[in-house]
Amino acid sequence: AHNLMSYRHTRAHNSLLVNGIGQPYSTEGYGSVMRAMGGQHISYCLGDASYAYRGISNDPMWVGYFKQAGIEQVPENGFGATPLTKYRRHVLMLHPHTVIVYDELEASEVVRWEWLLHSPTEFKIDATKKTLSTNNKTKGLVAVTQLFGGHVFTLSQTDRFVVPHTIT
């Protein structure tokens, strides 16, 4: 169950959930790279995931895995249709240490957007400045993320999986 609900699910990949729903495990939900360029000082990529959140997984292999795990592909489990109409992600890297992610998001109705950002170390959250920072002392890496948006949003973190990992 952990493999389907956490490891493979959109929620595990620094992406968005729309009303708690991620992408299906299906070729019917897809994305594409619209633009890409790389240079000595700057790199850029534009991805379009507008069609990536399209219903449930209907591939017989995945249907079998869900059945075997006793998991229904319903919104409460993060699967189903969404009113998403536009999801374009711009990623700009100013070499060597700055990455800017800008998402263009639209839906046909009011939705709850969730951006799930992952780190092997705990985030320090400053809700006033809308920043998250993390320091991985083992690897010698520091990351600071500042969030901008046109709507009020909340910041939170957890160290829990939707379905805990079990060793069998």
Describe every region a protein language model picked out.
Residues 2-168:
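CBM-like, beta-strand-rich accessory domains located in the C-terminal region of large
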